[in-house]
Regions:
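Radical SAM enzyme [4Fe-4S]-AdoMet core and its adjacent flexible, acidic
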Residues: 162-181, 192, 196-390
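Radical SAM/AdoMet-radical enzyme domain recognition
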Residues: 82-83, 87, 91-97, 106-234
Length: 457
């Protein structure tokens, strides 16, 4: 075995991201966003492991539901982890408030955690199974005087037929049985927006196994019109509580899920023009719905689109377009254009192509007037089995590159991970697959002692 720098060493995950901006799997890859326009996503850990639904599979360790939900613990840990992210990764990133079920937090504690994330320059997204009521959402975003304490929220709601215990759908047999619950979730936000002006972003998550792969296409057709701005699919992996493993999840990979997604959309969904991290892990297609038809941001086979992409990443890659005040963003864009005035013509040419893909200017204007234009992103995240992550991660901690091809591929994917968790107590940034496959087991065992379900005395 040869020597290899472990990516948990200070600065190494960031270096891996920057390297991916130049190369991908051994060759130049101009489509790579990591290290050029994004540092990657961030997530919390050990902040509220408990969940009140039962999923098959579940990425949590067996001890997760034996840990008490404690708001003070959550807010303190979120604050420490986000501060460390800011120190190591810079002033801005997207971060997930994730653990067990976020709505088990009291609304005040949930809001406090989101506000702490924003204090550290993070754009937070709450990860939920969606089985909470409008009253909870109202208490989360509205302050004691009736105003909004949270002007904008982002939620990723997980719905699939592998989940057990949802009110009204305790043991769903098909994905179609969950469509009313998917619609109800969006409707809660629409109604509160109409009343308070709340802004929101909603994503739809779905685990895919051999049991429901054949229902992905129909689910896409049903969910796309509902009002979500993203549909994300996660092929199941053998990770977490092994008592909940029911199938051979290796039968379902990123290609199979993407093909089912395209069947549901009704045409090809091109993803090759923009890549986020390792293509074995992530596949993402950004676009918009125009009168219900999905239109991609880029055509990866059109040289004019690719030229616009390259200009954008070369000149605007360091500009944060979300989370920046409009006036400040305008100043930043104008500053870039002052140094690269030719970018304006390239951008106009790209916009012309995008409008043409959407059916022409008249159609786009008409759809905008009808309110039927909105962003829509499709993605698949393919996680890895704990049986591979465990030994691969252990070798990486010793600075050793695996000789076994499967373990070496696992090491490559861990080193290129776009989804990171912070350990300020040890000075490490850890890939999510390593967190859930290796570190969660001991972490939740310790939390079970720190936050037992029953408090005596």
């Amino acid at each position: 075995m040869g020597a290899a720098q472990p990516p948990s060493a200070p600065g190494d995950l960031a270096r891996a991201g920057r390297a991916l901006g130049r190369t991908a799997r051994g060759g130049a890859d101009a489509s790579q966003l990591l290290g050029r326009h994004a540092v990657g996503c961030e997530g919390t850990h050990g902040v509220f492991p408990k969940c009140n639904l039962t999923c098959t599979p579940c990425y949590h360790s067996a001890d997760a539901n034996k840990v008490r939900v404690d708001g003070q613990h959550t807010v303190a840990q979120v604050d420490a982890q986000m501060a460390y992210f800011r120190q190591r990764r810079g002033p801005y990133a997207h971060a997930q408030l994730i653990g067990g079920e976020v709505s088990l937090l009291a609304p005040d504690d949930h809001a406090a955690a989101l506000l702490r994330m924003r204090t550290h320059g993070r754009e937070p997204m709450s990860m939920t199974h969606g089985d909470f009521d409008a009253d909870y959402l109202r208490e989360l975003v509205v302050d004691g005087r009736g105003g909004l304490r949270l002007q904008r929220v982002s939620f990723a709601a997980h719905f699939d037929s592998l989940m057990r215990g949802r009110r009204g759908a305790v043991r769903p047999r098909t994905e179609a049985e969950l469509h009313p619950f998917r619609r109800r979730f969006v409707q809660m936000f629409r109604e509160l927006r109409a009343e308070t002006g709340l802004r929101y972003y909603l994503a739809h998550n779905m685990t895919v196994t051999p049991a429901n792969l054949g229902q992905v296409a129909e689910t896409v057709r049903a969910v796309v019109p509902m009002g979500y701005s993203m549909m994300s699919f996660q092929p199941a992996a053998h990770v977490g509580d092994d008592r909940r493993w029911r199938e051979d999840y290796r039968q379902v990979g990123i290609d199979e899920v993407w093909a089912a997604l395209e069947e549901g959309v009704g045409h090809r969904v091109p993803w090759e023009g923009l890549q986020f991290g390792d293509p074995r892990c992530n596949r993402t297609a950004w676009g918009a719905l125009v009168d219900g038809r999905w239109v991609p941001v880029l055509d990866p086979h059109d040289a004019r689109d690719l030229a616009a992409r390259d200009r954008f990443l070369d000149h605007f890659g360091g500009v944060a377009f979300t989370g920046t005040a409009p006036a400040l963003l305008l100043v930043k864009v104008l500053r870039v254009l002052r140094h690269h005035p030719g970018d304006a013509a390239v951008a106009l040419r790209w916009a012309t192509l995008a409008v043409r893909r959407a059916g022409g200017l008249r159609r786009v204007i008409g759809a905008a007037r009808r309110g039927t234009v909105r962003p829509m992103t499709f993605e698949v995240h393919s996680f890895m089995d704990a049986a591979q992550v465990g030994p691969a991660w252990e070798l990486m901690q010793r600075g050793v590159a695996a000789e076994d091809p499967e373990l070496r591929a696992t090491q490559e994917r861990l080193a290129a991970c776009t989804y990171t968790m912070a350990h300020p107590e040890t000075g490490r940034l850890v890939p999510a697959c390593a967190q859930h496959s290796v570190l969660d087991v001991e972490e939740n065992a310790q939390l079970r002692k720190l936050l037992p379900l029953t408090v005596l005395g």
